């Protein structure tokens, strides 16, 4: 094993050869820059006065401070105002190298690898049932509400060939996870229910595939349904650019019923047939390159991360660079928990060793030069801080006068935390908006409590148990905690919270009517109207309108309300009572009293 590891091609050479250094500087009257920066940094690089820049923005109606992160357009405008030429330079470093660099392999080093298949489709169209049959396990019943809420990667063998599957959730909250699945995959199996046809998430999945330039195989599920309409379904697919072979197109199709285990082998055959055309290959003799599919925190083990190796071979003990982390892989296992020493290209694995769960969708690369890896990780970490500053600054400046409701999200997995964040950040109304200031994995910590207290945030947890000590601290610090295990509930709660910040609009609602049958006069109080309740109710404090011969003569409030000399809060239809109307004594027998309450209508 050690010989194979030392013989692997190092990724460092490819990276170093393609890194492009570009300095942010003012040179010969031209300001060269690579991206966003703070006002302070811009002033420092151009020898300008930062306070003067802030002042000029203020005069232009923009309330910035020296830490405000400038948009590229604002940098260009400042250059023009100060008679600088400007040039946006491309810089490839630790912040973006995995998106910009290509890894080259010699043809003789390439071998056939397992295809990576993503299953997509509309909610309840049978994706999870299909993957359930593929894995020969029972995911469906273990998920809250029967809807898949975590991305998983699994592998099967068909006709002596490995096939890797990714299952992506169908609910609209998981759009980012489906997009990520499309970008990782070689082929998308689009599950469409024979009775429902093409639905919103079906269309969305098709768009993801087109954007990622990924071929589609359609699996028409629920063929056992009596109300299926295949002609309609095929037409709907064609309208969305998916023309199947039966209609003269190139898209392969399989038909079946996942629940009845029908058509699945035929689907595998279609996958292997398309793989022959795609000629998928990788170099097992290089350090690993791949993508993080999912991550979560296990209380005993720490960060558990599901990955897919797309090129190279991953060994236990390898160092992986992902985002701003550089970590040694301590354990490797397959999706069933079996320990592994290595993972081949095209295969999934669950790994441990990361201090913090990596963001789902992040690319990773194996690097055996620790000093170089730390440099790249440091550059990425710096850029993340700049982006966070920009995000916070942009949110504060673009609140549009709305009340900002800060939210902290804690979830059991990274992908779900991301999905919740993506949904909540779109929520707003005319007077308030949601701002997610933190979204991560694992139990609530003291740091979370400090952040929530400092930012006046609500904490939402998903699929987590909150420790009694934390609950007690939440009460002491008066921090609101809301826990759920279904995403819909979190979204609904946030909408209700937004509604609470809307200025209320009230309308008058008539609640009852009475007529005066006798008049009493008391020197200390004034006139008492002995009355009979004809309809509805009268309540203490209610609005009252007094009519005499169909003419409105007074509007006021019920100041006192008594029955049989006892004070009461309410009198119902058919009962007599005595009342004094506030600041009104000119009451007469046969006057009609109409009672009203203000009812909120928004």
Curated annotation (Swiss-Prot):
GO terms for molecular function: GTP binding; GTPase activity; translation initiation factor activity. GTP binds at residues 121-128, 167-171, 221-224. Residues 146-150 are annotated as: G2. Pfam families: EF-G_D2, GTP_EFTU, IF-2, IF2_N. It comes from the Bacteria. Residues 221-224 are annotated as: G4. One of its GO terms (cellular component) is cytosol. Keywords: Cytoplasm, GTP-binding, Initiation factor, Nucleotide-binding, Protein biosynthesis. Residues 112-281 form the tr-type G domain. PROSITE patterns: G_TR_2. It is found in: Cytoplasm. Belongs to the TRAFAC class translation factor GTPase superfamily. Classic translation factor GTPase family. IF-2 subfamily. HAMAP family: IF_2_B. One of the essential components for the initiation of protein synthesis. Protects formylmethionyl-tRNA from spontaneous hydrolysis and promotes its binding to the 30S ribosomal subunits. Also involved in the hydrolysis of GTP during the formation of the 70S ribosomal complex. This is Translation initiation factor IF-2. It comes from Mycoplasmopsis synoviae (strain 53) (Mycoplasma synoviae).
């Amino acid at each position: 094993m050690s010989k194979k590891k030392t013989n692997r091609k190092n990724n460092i050479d490819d990276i170093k050869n393609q890194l492009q250094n570009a300095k942010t500087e003012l040179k010969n009257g031209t300001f060269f820059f690579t991206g966003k920066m703070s006002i302070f940094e811009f002033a420092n690089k151009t020898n300008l006065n930062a306070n003067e820049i802030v002042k000029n923005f203020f005069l232009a109606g923009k309330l910035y401070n020296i830490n405000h992160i400038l948009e590229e357009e604002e940098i260009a405008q400042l250059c023009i105002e100060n008679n600088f030429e400007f040039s946006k330079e491309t810089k490839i470093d630790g912040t973006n190298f995995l998106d910009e660099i290509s890894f080259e392999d010699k043809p003789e080093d390439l071998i056939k690898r397992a295809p990576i298949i993503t299953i997509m489709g509309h909610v309840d169209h049978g994706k999870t049932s299909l993957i359930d049959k593929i894995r020969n396990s029972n995911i469906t019943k273990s998920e809250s509400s029967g809807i898949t809420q975590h991305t998983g990667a699994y592998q099967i063998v068909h006709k002596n060939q490995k096939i890797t599957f990714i299952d992506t959730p169908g609910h609209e909250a998981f759009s980012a996870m489906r997009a990520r699945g499309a970008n990782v995959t070689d082929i998308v199996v689009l599950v469409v229910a024979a009775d429902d046809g093409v639905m919103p998430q079906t269309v969305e999945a098709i768009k993801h595939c087109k954007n990622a330039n990924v071929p589609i195989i359609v699996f028409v599920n629920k063929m056992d349904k009596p109300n299926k309409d295949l002609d309609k379904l095929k037409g709907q697919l064609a309208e969305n650019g998916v023309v199947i072979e039966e209609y003269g197109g190139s898209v392969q199709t399989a038909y079946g019923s996942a629940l009845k285990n029908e058509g699945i082998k035929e689907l595998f055959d279609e996958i292997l047939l398309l793989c022959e055309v795609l000629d998928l290959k990788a170099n097992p003799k290089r350090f690993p390159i791949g993508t993080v599919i999912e991550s979560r925190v296990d209380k005993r083990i720490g960060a558990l991360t599901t990955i897919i190796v797309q090129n190279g071979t991953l060994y236990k003990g390898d160092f992986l660079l992902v985002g701003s982390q550089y970590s040694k892989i301590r354990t490797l296992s397959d999706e069933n928990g079996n320990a592994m020493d290595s993972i081949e290209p095209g295969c999934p694995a669950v790994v441990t060793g990361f201090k913090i769960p990596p963001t789902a969708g992040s690319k990773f690369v194996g690097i055996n030069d620790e000093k170089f890896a730390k440099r790249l990780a440091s550059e990425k970490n710096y850029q993340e801080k700049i982006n966070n500053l920009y995000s916070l600054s942009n949110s504060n400046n673009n609140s549009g006068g709305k009340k900002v409701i800060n939210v902290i999200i804690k979830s059991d997995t990274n992908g779900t935390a991301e999905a919740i964040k993506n949904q909540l950040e779109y929520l707003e109304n005319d007077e308030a908006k949601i701002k997610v200031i933190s979204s991560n994995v694992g139990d609530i910590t003291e740091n979370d409590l400090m952040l929530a207290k400092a930012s006046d945030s609500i904490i939402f947890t998903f699929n987590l148990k909150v420790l009694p000590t934390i609950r007690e601290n939440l009460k002491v610090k008066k921090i609101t905690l809301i826990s759920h295990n279904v995403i819909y509930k979190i979204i609904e709660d946030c909408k209700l919270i937004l509604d609470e910040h809307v200025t209320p609009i009230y309308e008058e609602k008539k609640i009852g009517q009475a007529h005066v049958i006798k008049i009493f006069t008391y020197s200390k109080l004034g006139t008492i109207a002995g009355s009979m309740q004809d309809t509805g109710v009268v309540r203490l404090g209610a609005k009252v309108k007094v009519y005499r011969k169909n003419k409105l003569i007074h509007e006021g409030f019920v100041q006192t309300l008594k029955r049989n000399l006892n004070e009461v809060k309410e009198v119902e239809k058919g009962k007599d009572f005595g009342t004094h109307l506030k600041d009104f004594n000119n009451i007469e027998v046969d006057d009609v009293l109409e009672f009203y309450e203000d009812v909120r209508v928004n």
